[in-house]
Structure formats: C-alpha cells, structure tokens
Amino acid sequence: MINNYIDITIRLLENILDNEADYVKEAGAKVAESIENDGVIHLFGCGHSHILTEEVFYRAGGLAAIHPILHEPLMLHEGAAASSVLERKNDYAKTFMAEEDIRSGDVMIVLSTSGRNPVPIDVAEIAREKGAFVIVITSLQYSASQKSRHTSGKRLSDTGDIVIDNGAVKGDAVLKSANFDIAFAPTSTVTGAVILQSIFAEAIEKMVNDNFTPPVFISGNVENADEHNQALVDKYNERIPLLGMNL
C-alpha cells in the first residue's frame, strides 16, 4: 500500500506542477506584494483543512506575516462531528469574521477540498468585502461532483481571485482493498501543504528580487535565532496577536 499511495501522490504533485504552477506563481507574487506593503496573509480552513493553516504559521523557514483564523468550533478538538454540522451553516461565518482584522491590501487564502460548504465560501466573500485579495485552494473535480450547500449555489471556486486545484478525487481518499469497499488514504493534506509552501517560496523569491527583506523565521532550535525571531514577532504582533507570548 505504501507504494500505491506514494505513486498516486507523486502523480498528483506532478499534475499540480504541470497545470497549476502559473497560478501558484501568481499567488506568490500577490503575497509578496501584500507583505511589501505591510499587509498580512490570512488563512482559513474548516476541519482538517485548518491543519494546513497551522502548518505555515510561526514556521521555521516560513513567513512571519501569516495569520491563521482559528475558530475553535470549526476545528476538531471541541467536537469533530459538531464542526462538520457548523461548516454547513449558511451565514455562520458572520459570527466570527466580523471581528477579524482584515484590511485592504491583505491576502486571504481559503482552503476546502470539497468546496461545497457555506462557511469557507462566506469567509472568502467576507474577506473580499473587507478588501482582501482571495486565493482559493480546492479540488475542482471533487467540487463539481457535489451539489453546493450554499444558498447561492456557489462553490468555493466561484469566490477566488486565484483558484488552485489540489487535484483530489471525489471523497479525497485514493486507495481501495479487496473485500473492503470504502476508499481510504486521503491526499489533500499532502498536496495542500506543497501548494502553500510553494506559494510562499515564490513570494520569498519575489521579495528578494525586489530588494525587500522577506520576514522569515529561523528555527528556534538553531543557536542565536531568538533575537531574529523576536524582532519579527514584535513587528507583526499587533496585527497577528497569536504570535505573542501569553505566559
């Protein structure tokens, strides 16, 4: 099974490289432009998609200007099944997005593999209303196979200024076994992480080429990194309170 899973995942990544690279580069350029102009990069996802927003937050080798919107009822630790119910509620996003400090010139990255549920769609639209440039990471194949749950009939892919396809199959899981008819081994976390890290790598390279110093964290487990990292925390803590220390 390991060979099958890795082979399929490699093919998905190769497809992203072949078909989505231009969108990734365009997204990276928008991220660079935002950061160069004191903007912040916001990320949102429900359920397992939220894991990707934390993957790139306060990350060694990652950008400091990253703000994950972590609304706990839509994560998993307060009740996994409950989070799925809430994700399907139209207008629920208004209960937490109103207070988010999203400004003109910021970038909002919204992740949802199925792309059918109301909360990610509403998050994208509210962020745009606040002036953000919206990047969507979704599966176009999966999304097209399912009816939208949003009252407008929209899918997440309808809300993005840039839409990047993670290539996930319907249901996300790619493996099957004899005498067991439920698919297993999802791919969207792997492909999503690669897409996000590629966007930010493109952004960092663009900033360097623009003679702008990218705000990149150094691993805290490397000697003499603390002073460098603390300066970045101090720079962004007002806009991204999650970076601060609450000891």
UniProtKB/Swiss-Prot annotation:
The lineage of its organism: Bacteria, Bacillati, Bacillota, Bacilli, Bacillales. SUPFAM superfamilies: SIS domain (SSF53697). GO terms for biological process: carbohydrate derivative metabolic process. It comes from Listeria innocua serovar 6a (strain ATCC BAA-680 / CLIP 11262). Gene3D superfamilies: Glucose-6-phosphate isomerase like protein, domain 1 (3.40.50.10490). One of its GO terms (molecular function) is carbohydrate derivative binding. This is UPF0309 protein lin2794. Residues 31-214 form the SIS domain. Belongs to the UPF0309 family. PANTHER family: PHOSPHOHEPTOSE ISOMERASE (PTHR30390:SF7), SEDOHEPTULOSE 7-PHOSPHATE ISOMERASE / DNAA INITIATOR-ASSOCIATING FACTOR FOR REPLICATION INITIATION (PTHR30390). It comes from the Bacteria.
